[in-house]
Amino acid sequence: MTMIFDKGNVEDFDKELWDAIHAEEERQEHHIELIASENMVSKAVMAAQGSVLTNKYAESYPGNRYYGGTECVDIVETLAIERAKKLFGAAFANVQAHSGSQANAAAYMALIEAGDTVLGMDLAAGGHLTHGSPVNFSGKTYHFVGYSVDADTETLNYEAILEQAKAVQPKLIVAGASAYSRSIDFEKFRAIADHVGAYLMVDMAHIAGLVAAGVHPSPVPYAHIVTSTTHKTLRGPRGGLILTNDEALAKKINSAVFPGLQGGPLEHVIAAKAVAFKEALDPAFKDYAQAIIDNTAAMAAVFAQDDRFRLISGGTDNHVFLVDVTKVIANGKLAQNLLDEVNITLNKNAIPFETLSPFKTSGIRIGCAAITSRGMSVKESQTIARLIIKALVNHDQETILEEVRQEVRQLTDAFPLYKK
């Protein structure tokens, strides 16, 4: 009998699936990736995630598993835990959360009860679905009240947030964002939380790599719980991470993840997280993170100097920025689709005090982590900004759009994603 194990590779065994995978590899290779939540992992991360660890079930935690034969995965998970603790200066780490959303769900479960009041950043102001959107579990389970940004500066107004916290008396305050381009003052957030007797949870999913490298202030000394993804600026596999310095909360977090929300952990993904944490502990990672910030600032500055576009909040301190494109094209959705046609990938995004529907939006969101992983610098970042402007301003001129496609191809050829 021919065993399934004899099917040595995807290309030979499942050509239809392989073609789709290969097409995605080609798309990544020849498109400029500017989606702020995406990055490009190393081959070592991919190798760990594709290892035999995918075969092993390991419910519970190292040294206390429900199944036998876990001595090897215990080593793997412990490596990931210890590296995460060292990387972020935290006393405790849970690396089992399958995603950032599940990490947030576990944090909520550890800190509050269903129906409790939570103060979180409004989605339209730059927050995340899990920070209280009514269509998300967070908004359905807890009583979320949204805080926004200042109408004039489009930045967080900590005095206003304090007054709002006094008014609603939340059990928990959530800081962190998915589309906020400015540095967040976590010390001020902790002071607000302490003033009203609330817990502080920080979702640092977008900025985790910058925090790890020390180029963005860390929330770990101030938050009761910090959650994150392990991809985005951290450049690891898609997954979640939870940190705390409080032993009692660490126990609650572990119980919330397992058995509260999940069964067996994905040890192959945890191995890939361990690789990514080791990569981020290398001194060279700080140079990478600083390059992200430099590239993002350089790209944003090009838009700031063009009065046909409006840079939200006037600039950026991290890996991301938002641009109001409605002076040159009807909405962000059309901008996203047009740029897709010239092989530049980004996403439509609501801007503060948005007037269009979430399916259209006035803005686009741009992030520079992925192009920095390819080795692009300030010069290329400025070039990409000019190409975006060229395409959007001339969105009905196919000859010019073809010029942009060719210039994009020249850039991607000069900075190959995975050298053959």
Curated annotation (Swiss-Prot):
Please name the pathway.
One-carbon metabolism; tetrahydrofolate interconversion; Amino-acid biosynthesis; glycine biosynthesis; glycine from L-serine: step 1/1
The record's catalysed reaction(s) read:
(6R)-5,10-methylene-5,6,7,8-tetrahydrofolate + glycine + H2O = (6S)-5,6,7,8-tetrahydrofolate + L-serine
For this chain, one GO molecular function annotation is: pyridoxal phosphate binding
Where N6-(pyridoxal phosphate)lysine occurs, the residues are: K232
Q: Which residues form the signal peptide?
A: none
Q: Which Gene3D superfamilies match?
A: Aspartate Aminotransferase, domain 1 (3.90.1150.10), Type I PLP-dependent aspartate aminotransferase-like (Major domain) (3.40.640.10)
| Annotated site (Plays an important role in substrate specificity) | H231
The subcellular localization recorded is: Cytoplasm
Q: What is its main location?
A: cytoplasm
User: Cross-referenced InterPro entries, in alphabetical order?
Assistant: PyrdxlP-dep_Trfase, PyrdxlP-dep_Trfase_major, PyrdxlP-dep_Trfase_small, Ser_HO-MeTrfase, Ser_HO-MeTrfase-like, Ser_HO-MeTrfase_PLP_BS, SHMT-like_dom
Q: Which GO terms describe its cellular component?
A: cytosol
- Positions binding (6S)-5,6,7,8-tetrahydrofolate in this chain are L123, G127, H128, L129, S357, P358, F359
Which cofactors go with this protein?
pyridoxal 5'-phosphate
Q: Which UniProt keywords apply?
A: Amino-acid biosynthesis, Cytoplasm, One-carbon metabolism, Pyridoxal phosphate, Transferase
What Enzyme Commission number(s) appear in the record? Answer: 2.1.2.1
The biological process GO terms on file are: glycine biosynthetic process from serine; tetrahydrofolate interconversion
Database matches in NCBIfam families: PRK00011.1
- Which PANTHER family has this protein been placed in? SERINE HYDROXYMETHYLTRANSFERASE, SERINE HYDROXYMETHYLTRANSFERASE 1
What does the annotation say about its assembly with partners?
Homodimer.
Q: What is the documented function of this protein? A: Catalyzes the reversible interconversion of serine and glycine with tetrahydrofolate (THF) serving as the one-carbon carrier. This reaction serves as the major source of one-carbon groups required for the biosynthesis of purines, thymidylate, methionine, and other important biomolecules. Also exhibits THF-independent aldolase activity toward beta-hydroxyamino acids, producing glycine and aldehydes, via a retro-aldol mechanism.
Q: Which family does it belong to?
A: Belongs to the SHMT family.
Protein name according to UniProt: Serine hydroxymethyltransferase
